[in-house]
Amino acid sequence: ISHKLANLGLKSGDRILVKSPKCKETLSLYLSSILTGAVFFPLNSSYTLNETIYFIEDSKPTILICESSEVKSIKPICDKIGCKILSLNANGEGEVTNGLEDLDNFFKPNNRAKDDLAALLYTSGTTGKPKGAMLTHQNLVSNALQLINLWNIDKSDTLIHALPIYHTHGLFVAINTSMMSGASIRFIKNFNIDLVIEAFKFSTLMI
């Protein structure tokens, strides 16, 4: 996926807006954007078109990822700002994953400084329009390492992940701590109490 993004012109410092469902391919997009040196901007997949337009115009992404059913309605605003648009659906299929077998498995990461921007998250907008909050690579790394130490997470742990992945706790806390500690993840796409209770039998952590 990193090769595909780079081939589309995504480079260090560019923003990639990801409005796709919770699936492992969306997580791959997050990791791929970090490898390319881009700024990852996850967006609530349930936002309306008008809400989405605001975030596009304000963040000015280079690439936008959404479900195929939304491409037609979002494309005009992307064309207006010169943003490329690709599809990714809940089953992991779409333009993002098409043709990956023809690309090299190895991607040399673009070097980034610890204070370079890694991710962009918007506030809820309770006092006005949502505002972009900037997270650096050092922000993400230091946060994950502190929590790994505080919670004593290691490779023997298995995390129940039942949160959305478009906000801090569901993406940066849960995913980063698991990846950096070597822990496993039981990935529940939509919260379901029966699935969560069943997962208790095989897990040591829940977020």
Where does each model-flagged region fall?
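Conserved AMP-binding
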Residues: 20-23, 44, 153, 163-167
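ATP-dependent adenylate-forming carboxylate-activation enzymes
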Residues: 20-21, 41-57, 68-70, 183-203
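Conserved AMP-binding/adenylation subdomain of ANL enzymes
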Residues: 141-158, 168-206
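Conserved pre-ATP/AMP-binding loop-to-beta segment of ANL
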Residues: 103-122, 129, 152-158
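Short hydrophobic alpha-helices that are characteristic scaffold elements of the AMP-binding
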Residues: 31-36, 58, 167, 176-180
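Conserved AMP-binding A3 loop
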Residues: 118-145
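Conserved AMP-binding/adenylate-forming
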Residues: 2-47
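Conserved S/T- and glycine-rich ATP-binding loop of Class I adenylate-forming
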Residues: 16, 33, 64, 117, ...
